[in-house]
């Protein structure tokens, strides 16, 4: 049994995702993580591995997560491939019937959404190519010479070069959308196209099943009368009212076909030469009637352009009162998580930013000159025979705050989840403590400098040093801070491993 999942369900899913982000009952977050990629793969930066989609790796994504940023309604858009118009480039034209046996002439695409049939001009206006100059002498179309710049509702040529292109204006990308969502490979489509007022003129001008283009792939032989024009030639099919004008040249061949009345309601159609009074001659011409998408051109921009991708805009930056995003260490993973929960709670996280790290407020004579190497290990003896181990994310010499993470590599497994027979620190991950037991201590030894201690006298989210207030990004209780998000909650729905960058 042969079956497919159509592109339309992909478009539907993209739209549903956008709606989900807009739903107040949901919380979507982007996240950054993984400061130690070389522990996973030595050549990570030159060849990042493809993320693995299993529960073991999902747990590791959580354990190596650094911080999260809320994705709001204005941070998500459906997008389509960005094809910038360039003089001399030949583009595919819109067709309703691309397939493996009827590929796009220019790109070779076997389906519409893989073809290069729409463009972005220099003014950030988007046009669909309804005719690319294709004719029996140029079956692959011709180079485009005139950049479309008009905003007329009806399709037309863009200039006087005679390149044969017919363009239809669809929409203009707003400056605010350009800044947030126009990328190297993708460009946004407008929100609320089906119901909004901003692009209503284009949408409301669409005619369901209205014919705009008839192409000529064979000019025929011995047609009609030389140098004649035949008007009101009917276009037959399951719609009604469409007509075209056929020009026959001096060789009694079809020179051009122009739609004079688009009609409506067509899902298939043919030109009826006989009913139009055009003698068919010895060889009938081959005329292809191009059927518009459902609703007509401009009715549903998502369906017409294949908007099954979503682009998320997430600006990863600190503010003075909530510095959750670390600096001085690298990140090599980004992702998206749906409905994570607050730490120690089943309540869905709603904060604009959240830290996924543990943190210690340290004190000691040399805290302002001590250093902790990024990704290095540090320990606390919590009690006799019990050691807490963390790996350094960063250390702030001004505030004495040490941020860290703990993953399975600290408890009997390597980074890829393989069990180790003799782990250095045992098989348990122990939390750092402001109240160590018998045989334990508050001492934390830095990479360089004098020994420091957990500052059990400090609780709060900010500290004052030399009459200046410093916000720490997360709340401390007796010198120890938990993450702000409950690890392993919600659904990680997107992961991207990438070459590491250092945040500064």
What residue ranges belong to the model's regions?
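Feature for peripheral, non-core segments
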Residues: 1-126, 130-504
